[in-house]
Regions:
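Nucleotide donor/acceptor-binding cores
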Residues: 108, 143-145, 241
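Conserved SAM/SAH cofactor-binding pocket of Class I
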Residues: 116, 122-204
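Active-site-adjacent beta-strand anchor residues
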Residues: 6, 111, 119, 172, ...
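N-terminal auxiliary segments of SAM/dcSAM-dependent transferases
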Residues: 1-101
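A short helix-to-beta-strand connector/capping loop
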Residues: 56, 84, 105-106, 167, ...
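SAM-dependent Rossmann-like transferase core, predominantly class I methyltransferases
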Residues: 69-141
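S-adenosylmethionine
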Residues: 174-285
């Protein structure tokens, strides 16, 4: 086993995620008390890693023998750092969460272990949605906005939104297993008293007027999104409300954006992470 390592500026994290999308064993992690991030890419052979070294510098070396099963266990998996607001751990132990809270004072620490539902935070679609959610929440007064997470999976986006200042929120998923997993995650983390969770179909459910969202997240398949834009539009509280959509393969991005445009949305931001695209949309004025 070989590893290539390089320190990068935090503001370049997204472009490095895209650059390293072909490497299944690529990890970007924050170091305690450091302003820069550490990129590590592992491979059985040095060839591709030496190519990275040739292009970008850093360090390439063989890895000492160790128990890789233990090394990749949840308690040894680096937490996901989202902006300066969120820390998401795959570990469910109270001791680990307390340790992370001490290591990252002032940040919101959440526990989302891998289960049968999608969305622990590490997938490019979920992590990009989380970054956009953090950015949008900063613009809104705490306790003065509402959130909807359509196709919530584990519930990570909805709970993050509540912790970031939403007054109330709604999470729903078509998959009953996802709803079960999300319920466990909300109970473990707390802070979801004003977050309503239930099973529903994006093509059938509609919010009451007082439930409509200022931030609406929909991390769904692009084919579902293209059909769901009219329903999603009806979930927005006001023309300035933001719709964040993901789950879009890069080759399906243009047709998905065209569908959004047909239903009155304009593109505010687009982020590509590997083969996945996330978009921030708003109703055209």
């Amino acid at each position: 086993m070989w590893v290539w390592k390089k320190h990068i500026a935090a503001e370049h994290e997204e472009e490095w995620q895209e650059r390293l999308a072909e490497f299944p064993w690529a990890v970007i992690s924050a170091l305690p008390h450091a302003k820069r991030l550490l990129v590590e890419v592992y491979d059985e052979a040095p060839g591709k890693l030496l190519a990275l070294y040739s292009c970008y510098g850093g360090d390439c070396s063989p890895v000492e023998e160790k128990d890789w099963v233990a090394a990749t266990a949840p308690e040894n998996t680096p937490p996901l750092i989202i902006r300066d607001r969120l820390v998401i751990s795959a570990d469910a132990s109270e001791a680990k969460i307390n340790e992370l809270q001490a290591r990252y004072p002032g940040r919101i620490v959440l526990s989302f272990p891998a289960e049968r539902a999608f969305g622990t935070g590490n997938h490019a679609t979920t992590s990009t949605c989380l970054r956009m959610l953090c950015d949008e929440a900063k613009k809104l007064a705490p306790g003065q906005w509402r959130l909807i997470d359509a196709g919530c999976g584990t519930g990570v986006l909805g709970l993050a939104g509540m912790r970031l200042g939403a007054q109330s929120g709604i999470c729903y998923d078509f998959d009953p297993i996802a709803v079960e997993v999300a319920e466990r995650n909300l109970q473990r983390n707390g802070g979801a008293e004003n977050l309503r969770l239930f099973q529903a179909d994006v093509f059938e459910w509609s919010p009451k007027p007082e439930e409509k969202a200022h931030i609406l997240l929909a991390n769904l398949f692009s084919t579902v999104l293209q059909r769901a834009f009219p329903r999603l539009k009806a979930c927005l509280a006001e023309p300035e409300s933001v719709l964040i959509v993901s789950g879009i393969l890069r080759e399906q991005a243009e047709e998905t954006l065209a569908a959004a445009n047909r239903h009155g949305f304009e593109l505010l931001r687009r982020v590509t992470a590997g083969k996945w695209v996330t978009m921030k949309l708003r109703q055209r004025s």
